[in-house]
Amino acid sequence: MELDAKLDLNVVAVDSGETVHLLLELEAPGLEGERRRDPANLQVVLDRSGSMGDGSLLAALQAIDSLVGKLSPDDQLGLVCFDDSVIVPIAAGPVGDGGAIRSALRHIHTGGMTNLSSGLMRGIQEADRASADRAATLVLLSDGHANEGVTDHPTLEGVAKGATGHKITVSTIGIGHGYDEDLLEAISRGGGGNSHFAENGDEAGAHLAGEVEGLLEQVIQAASLTVKPTGDVSGIRLYNDLPTSEIKDGFMVELGELVSEEKRRLLF
């Protein structure tokens, strides 16, 4: 792990009570030797029907935004959204610097009914197109019941099963207590993936992150940073929204997992 610390002040007068800010930059090591992981292929299929307006859609979009920072420029990411129709805000392709993806996320809003089948089928098409015969993971998030298009459970399970023949794994995340649990379980069963229940949009984002972790090669797990101020420091504050715990003479910041060459910034 490489660390670089920068202060906003070079000199502080003794007993001045000055506030000093510290920017700590961390970079995880790269993979050893010549071994590099293959580009990950992730396709997200997101319900944007009217019922997702309770905050679930926003939380899911924020989760996707945070995932962009964990993906490498050559990783593939695509997003298909559905209500009573299907849109492709992010055509499956390389992440690049993430700017275009984040811009597209800001323009996604809730719509009408729930044509889940069209969203699933379009997502599979995108994943197959972009993966170039490599493995891909499709994650479908929904909070409701399919009420337009194909709604038959065995048929949709068969659609997901057909995707596995193209090296596409299909997982599902059901949000809240009103979604069709049997349908999403059937789809994930057919697609050879996982079926998750999320109490709310924030939990859905956590499950989505968990699915992505399986695609990425982690070089550091359960990382933490110990902060122990000297006697000359009267107080310290972490501006990042990260879990912390008190220890003797300081506190510990939980950083979690870091992938190859991932960069983090902490502001104190």
Question: What are the language-model segments listed below?
Answer:
Residues 1-4:
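Extreme N-terminal starter segment of soluble prokaryotic enzymes
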Residues 6-222:
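Exposed acidic/Ser/Thr-rich ligand/metal-binding surfaces
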